[in-house]
Structure formats: structure tokens, C-alpha cells
Swiss-Prot record:
Residues 76-79 are annotated as: Involved in Mg(2+) ion dislocation from EF-Tu. GO terms for cellular component: cytoplasm. Belongs to the EF-Ts family. This is Elongation factor Ts. It is found in: Cytoplasm. The keyword Oxidoreductase does not apply. Keywords: Cytoplasm, Elongation factor, Isopeptide bond, Protein biosynthesis, Ubl conjugation. Associates with the EF-Tu.GDP complex and induces the exchange of GDP to GTP. It remains bound to the aminoacyl-tRNA.EF-Tu.GTP complex up to the GTP hydrolysis stage on the ribosome. GO terms for molecular function: translation elongation factor activity. The keyword Ion transport does not apply. It comes from Mycolicibacterium smegmatis (strain ATCC 700084 / mc(2)155) (Mycobacterium smegmatis). It holds the Pfam family EF_TS. CDD domains: UBA_EF-Ts.
Length: 275
């Protein structure tokens, strides 16, 4: 008897772009373990698996103010465009600043007007008849550049970035930090440096690269060099300082920051509908 359902196959196809038969076979080989099935499809060459697997289903918006960034979810984009929903997000991000809230539990308990953030969300949810959720929050207390991006002109911002930085020259610092925020919004860096990437994630990427190269029939003696090349490519995808700059792809983000005398100390990126 199969240890997976038709819904599992459908979800795996949506996340990975793989065909029905490949998805079924991956679930069989993984003994019903969904995450393992995704990994097997990566090894076998399904396109964009890693990027698609990050997706979630949600609508809503991101809002930023004075070092704070929040994501507030709704069930539909109709509500995301609602003026009261957007006003609530503004109230919540202001509360995040006042409370210096770096997590949703702290922020839910924070005051907004004569109530709490949690109650304000519940009140609007009851009024409009749709589930609303405060999904995540971040707060940086240093010098911060924020950037918000809209997916469509008639929708509120769906991508938000905070970049905390240090700079000797305020104007150069702000200019460089803004460029970095745009970079993060577009290329979705997850880590600041290579050292920030967890060892188990690097080891897993190395293993997948080796298995993929073997499946492609690469000669055994060439595997170490191929694997290192693919791991380097992985770093360029996920590590901010290793990425080619969108403003000058002949230079890395690190090189451009060094030229400007700017140090990025941390960053965060929220995107509605993604993990």
C-alpha cells in the first residue's frame, strides 16, 4: 500500500516542477518522506526545485519603519488591498519600533492604542471575516536602510529588506546600503558570509553535488573539482558578500562595499508567501 496520497503528489509537483511519474517515484523511493522526495528530485535534476520548495501560500504585506520590519498575512489579495488592513500593518510596525520587538510573541503583546497588537488583529479579523496572521517581525537598533518592493502597482509591498550597516561617511553609507537592500530583494541572499551558512547545509549541498555529478556520468577523478565548483556556485546564490553585484556584475558585493568603506553587520528579508 502506498505511504503517500494524491495530495502529496500534487504538492510535490507544484513545489518542484517535476512530472507526475517522477514525483510518484520520488515519494516511493523516499518511503513517503516529503522532504527526502524533494531532495531526490534535486539530485535527479528537477529544475528550480530549491527555489520552488521555499514557496508558501499566503497573501498580505510587509511594512517597515525605523529599523522594524513585519509581515502581516491575509487569506486573499482583496483583503491585502483593504485600507483598514494596511492601516493595521502601519500600527503594528509602529508598535514594533516602540517595543523593539524582534519576534512575533513580543510584538503580539505590545500595545497599540488602547489594546494589544494581538487583539487588534483579532478585532479586524472578526470585522472583515477573514483569518489574519502576524507571521514574523524583526528589529535592528543600529543604522538601518529599509527597502520595500511591490509585485504589482495595485498591491501593497510584498518584499521587505532591512540592512544594518556601519560607515565612515553617512551619505556613502546610505547609498551603498540602499544598493545592497535592492540586491537582497532581487537575489534573495540568505546569509551574510560563508561562515554564517550552517555546516550541515553545506555538507548536504556537497553531497547532492557529488551524487548529481555521478548521475551525470562525470569521471571519478574529476568529481572533487566539480563538487567544489558547484558548492562555490551555491555560495554565490545564498551568501550576500559572495554574490556578483547587480550594479556591476564584474565585482562582488563585498568588493563594492569595501570600496565604499561600508560594513554590513546583518540583514533580513521577508517575502509574503515564502518561507
Amino acid at each position: 500500500m502506498a505511504n503517500y496520497t494524491a495530495a502529496d503528489v500534487k504538492r510535490l509537483r507544484e513545489l518542484t516542477g517535476a512530472g507526475m511519474l517522477d514525483s510518484k517515484n520520488a515519494l516511493v523511493e523516499a518511503d513517503g518522506d516529503f522532504d527526502k522526495a524533494v531532495e531526490l528530485l534535486r539530485i535527479k535534476g528537477a529544475k528550480d526545485v530549491g527555489k520552488r520548495a521555499e514557496r508558501a501560500t499566503a497573501e498580505g504585506l510587509v511594512a517597515a519603519k525605523d529599523g522594524a520590519l513585519i509581515e502581516l498575512n491575509s487569506e486573499t489579495d482583496f483583503v491585502a488591498k483593504n485600507a483598514e488592513f494596511q492601516a493595521l500593518a502601519d500600527q503594528i510596525v509602529a508598535a514594533a519600533v516602540a517595543a523593539k520587538a524582534n519576534d512575533i510573541e513580543t510584538l503580539k503583546a505590545a500595545k497599540t492604542g488602547d489594546t494589544t497588537v494581538e487583539q487588534a488583529i483579532a478585532d479586524l479579523s472578526a470585522k472583515i471575516g477573514e483569518k489574519l496572521e502576524l507571521r514574523r517581525a524583526a528589529y535592528f537598533d543600529g543604522t538601518v536602510e529599509a527597502y520595500l518592493h511591490k509585485r504589482a502597482a495595485d498591491l501593497p509591498p510584498a518584499v521587505g529588506v532591512l540592512v544594518e550597516y556601519q560607515a565612515g561617511d553617512a551619505d556613502k553609507g546610505k547609498e551603498a546600503a540602499h544598493a545592497v537592500a535592492l540586491q537582497i530583494a532581487a537575489l534573495k541572499a540568505k546569509y551574510l558570509t560563508r561562515e554564517d551558512v550552517p555546516e550541515d547545509i553545506v555538507a548536504n549541498e556537497r553531497r547532492i553535488a557529488e551524487e548529481t555529478a555521478r548521475n551525470e556520468g562525470k569521471p571519478e577523478q574529476a568529481l572533487p573539482k566539480i563538487v567544489e565548483g558547484r558548492v562555490t556556485g551555491f555560495y554565490k546564490d545564498v551568501v550576500l558578500l559572495d554574490q556578483p553585484s547587480v550594479s556591476d556584475n564584474k565585482k562582488t558585493v563585498k568588493a563594492l562595499l569595501d570600496e565604499a568603506g561600508v560594513t554590513v553587520t546583518r540583514f533580513v528579508r521577508f517575502e509574503v508567501g515564502q518561507a
